[in-house]
A protein has these predicted regions:
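Bacterial N-terminal signal peptides that target proteins for export
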Residues: 1-8
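N-terminal, intrinsically disordered, polar/charged segments of Gram-positive cell-envelope systems
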Residues: 9, 13-15, 19-53
Length: 195
């Protein structure tokens, strides 16, 4: 059971890292733009400073929510910091969680072709990104582009990898338990699938 849980948690972290992480080019660009000298406060225990450093990396590189950063810092399958060090990191982390949610949401749309509703669900899910409702809504309101192409790419994936009929694809695209695209987005996808 413990091994299965480790594998599940590891897979969840990898999925989130892939979906929400920044490309190397973006990191290089952001690093050049944000060169800031920080003086390390030696009155703060090294363990606390290490937790803060890890938290900064999770925020800047993986665009994690406050709760996911805390969970990763304290997880026995993660960084294993004590709760005091993790709380210090959270309290002293200078992060824009709206922007983290936005970058994470943009990556879900771009790489996984998710609908607005699925992105929102993933961003707020307790087994997903754990952003607040307000942060997730900020992301949804600011993700650029329409969702017609995302629906089409998702439909093509179902057609090619699962050999589904157009009716089954439409149902999957619009299902509350599936992709959660709007009827208009799903119909666009069906109308533009290869024959």
């Amino acid at each position: 059971m413990k091994k299965g849980l480790k594998v599940f948690l590891g897979a969840a972290i990898v999925l989130s890292a892939v979906a929400c992480s920044t490309s190397n080019d973006e990191v290089k660009k952001e690093t050049k733009e944000k060169v800031v000298e920080t003086k390390e406060d030696t009155s703060v225990p090294k363990e606390y400073r290490n937790a803060l450093h890890k938290a900064e990396n999770y925020s800047k590189m993986m665009h994690m929510s406050k709760q996911r950063i805390y969970d990763q810092l304290t997880s026995k399958y993660g960084d294993q910091f004590d709760v005091e060090a993790a709380q210090y990191a959270i309290d002293n982390l200078n992060a824009d969680y709206n922007e983290n949610a936005l970058k994470c949401g943009e990556n879900y749309k771009k790489t996984m072709h998710m609908s607005k509703a699925r992105i929102y669900d993933q961003l707020t899910s307790e087994s997903g990104e754990k952003f607040t409702a307000e942060q997730a809504q900020y992301a949804i309101d600011n993700i650029k582009g329409d969702y017609l192409e995302a629906a089409l790419k998702s439909a093509k994936n179902y057609q090619e990898t699962m050999s589904m009929s157009k009716d089954a694809i439409y149902d999957q695209l619009t299902s509350e338990y599936g992709e959660k695209f709007t009827a208009e987005e799903a119909q666009y996808a069906i109308d533009n699938l290869d024959e």
